[in-house]
Swiss-Prot record:
Residues 291-542 form the Glutamine amidotransferase type-1 domain. It comes from Bradyrhizobium diazoefficiens (strain JCM 10833 / BCRC 13528 / IAM 13628 / NBRC 14792 / USDA 110). UTP binds at S13, K186, T187, K188, P189, T190, Q191, K222. This is CTP synthase. The gene is pyrG. Transmembrane segments: none annotated. The keyword NADP does not apply. GO terms for cellular component: cytosol. Mg(2+) binds at D71, E139. It comes from the Bacteria. Homotetramer. Pfam families: CTP_synth_N, GATase. ATP binds at S14, L15, G16, K17, G18, L19, D71, R238, D239, V240. Allosterically activated by GTP, when glutamine is the substrate; GTP has no effect on the reaction when ammonia is the substrate. The allosteric effector GTP functions by stabilizing the protein conformation that binds the tetrahedral intermediate(s) formed during glutamine hydrolysis. Inhibited by the product CTP, via allosteric rather than competitive inhibition. Disulfide bonds: none annotated.
């Protein structure tokens, strides 16, 4: 039977519960255990699909088409286990399911209440489908004290009593701020956070304390005394130089040993961490540097591109170089010449996005890369803008544009109205809802034999990648674009939807309709990112 680890947060948000959960999952995995990670999000949205990137950050898409929290990306990258739609749920989804059942009459006239109906739904979600796992790590979003989170805290409180003895452990992630004027770490915020947690019936078994310095023994003793935990269970979560150093740092601090002790499990074998040590060796001792310009719309909120940042880092790890990122707001290029901003970079990446704001700037970035032979990687929207640039400046279609921005005489990019998902036909219309209506999840693509992208994938002629888009390049313009050098080197297996474009006579210019960053791992860098960084290394010698 699976054992459950519940990770909560206190004092402030954005402490890194997702990373802590992922790192602990990796440590347990390194000891030979089979782990599953799940996220409970207290907000009322059904999913983060329609939320602003400025508020929520990246939307992480799974193979089965779920739009989920970015923490699931950490889970995948650290454990290698693909997440599914069953690994993330929101208050909105729970309420929707309950109300649907109530309208159907499933509750036989009962008064629907938070306790027991909402809490039971949360417990059912947490417990479902875990028979094949040794440990299930469940992260509760937000911080203790948030009104939205109360049903989730009540549910995990009940679960400890529902499960057999020694089958549930609570870890509370908190902050120990350092006050320079006093010259000491302050424990009072953590004490109050634990007091709040205990007031709703949850006694943490382990305190994971974020800090930028060593925790003095006296402060550990104080935290153990006033928070009612063993002194050995006060774990120091020191800041590290890169996120892939977190598993080893937490192991050295004793987190995984303390978790096993809390379950009454004798430590069998130490975790095998050599692969993590090798990753960190490459991160800390690069053999060179490259600079990549990210020309995007949400550059003020780096979390909007979380998986992208990590995938570029993985490309650097694969090539033993440090990848420096130059963030550029694409709107700038609508007013200014891109050259002064881009002449020094070794590669240009235009990521996914939505809407007209900044689109012309992205088109100009693609033009600069094409004309100056700078490696270019266009992802989703970035591919579409590269195609529009080619249509305007190579083919001579001056009015080439996307119907996403309004009516146009030359719709190079248009709304997908239907596509195949397996053997089923999916249909959409302009008047449809925004939420959950995109082409989402893993879809296959057929690659042209001998094309550059096929070579990047090791000679493969069919791949599967994750998508998140509702607009698509119009194949009616395919022949004219190919006559001017822009090759459609990847299509959906039925030949209807363009997936990949490339220039054969360019050092490295590839646009993809999918999101390869979602499948990149530190131990398995995505081939497109590894190849892109390799091309940037070559370009760096020419600057």
């Amino acid at each position: 039977m699976a054992r459950y680890i519940f990770i909560t947060g206190g004092v402030v948000s954005s402490l890194g519960k997702g990373l802590a959960s992922a790192a602990l999952g990796a440590l347990l995995q390194a000891r030979g255990y089979k782990v599953r990670l799940r996220k409970l999000d207290p907000y009322l949205n059904l999913d983060p699909g329609t939320m602003s990137p400025y508020q929520h950050g990246e939307v992480f898409v799974t193979d089965d088409g779920a739009e989920t929290d970015l923490d699931l990306g950490h889970y995948e990258r650290f454990t290698g286990r693909p997440a599914t739609k069953a690994d993330n749920i929101t208050t909105g989804r729970i309420y929707q399911d309950i109300i649907t059942k109530e309208r159907r009459g499933d509750y036989l006239g009962a008064t629907i209440q938070v306790v027991p109906h909402v809490t039971n739904a949360i417990k059912e979600f947490v417990l479902d489908g875990n028979d094949d796992y040794d440990f299930v790590l469940v992260e509760i979003g937000g911080t203790v004290g948030d009104i939205e989170g109360l049903p989730f805290f009540e549910a995990i409180r009940q679960l400890k009593n529902d499960l057999p003895r020694d089958h549930a452990v609570y870890i509370h992630l908190t902050l120990l701020p350092y006050i320079p004027s006093a010259g000491e770490l302050k424990t009072k915020p953590t004490q109050h956070s634990v007091k709040e947690l205990r007031s709703i019936g949850i006694q943490p078994d382990i305190l994971l304390c974020r800090t930028d310095r060593e925790i003095p023994k006296e402060e550990r003793r104080k935290l153990g005394l006033f928070c009612n935990v063993r002194e050995s269970a006060v774990i120091e979560a020191r800041d590290v130089d890169n996120i892939y150093a977190v598993p080893e740092a937490y192991h050295n601090a004793g987190l995984d040993d303390e978790v096993l002790a809390a379950f009454g499990i004798a430590s069998r074998i130490p975790p095998e961490l050599r692969s993590w040590q090798q990753i960190n060796e490459r991160v800390r001792n690069p053999e060179g540097n490259v600079t990549i310009a990210i020309v995007g719309k949400y550059t003020g909120m780096k979390d909007a591109y979380k998986s992208l940042i990590e995938a570029l880092s993985h490309g650097g790890i694969a090539n033993k170089v440090k990848v420096n990122l130059d963030w550029i707001e694409s709107e700038i290029f609508e007013k200014e010449d891109p050259a002064p901003f881009l002449e020094h970079v070794n590669g240009i990446l235009v990521p996914g996005g939505f809407g007209q704001r900044g689109a012309e700037g992205k088109i100009r970035a693609a033009q600069f890369a094409r004309e100056r032979d700078v490696p270019y990687f266009g992802i989703c929207f970035g591919m579409q803008m590269a195609v529009i640039e080619a249509a305007r400046n190579l083919v001579g279609i001056e009015d080439a544009n996307s119907t996403e921005f309004g009516p146009t005489k030359e719709p190079l990019v248009g709304l997908m109205t239907e596509w195949l998902r397996g053997n089923e036909l999916e249909k959409r219309s302009q008047a449809g809802d925004l939420g959950g209506t995109m082409r989402l999840g893993a879809y296959p693509a057929a690659l042209n034999r001998g094309s550059r992208v096929s070579q990047v994938y090791g000679g493969a002629t069919e791949i599967s990648e994750r998508h998140r888009h509702r607009y698509e390049v119009n194949t009616a313009y395919k022949d004219r674009l190919e006559q001017h050098g822009l090759k459609f080197s990847g299509l959906s297996p039925d030949g209807v939807l363009p997936e990949i474009v490339e220039y054969e006579d360019h050092p490295w210019f590839i646009g993809v309709q999918f999101h390869p960053e979602l499948k990149s791992r530190p131990f398995e860098p995505h081939p497109l990112f590894a190849s892109f960084i390799q091309a940037a290394m070559v370009q760096s010698r020419l600057v």
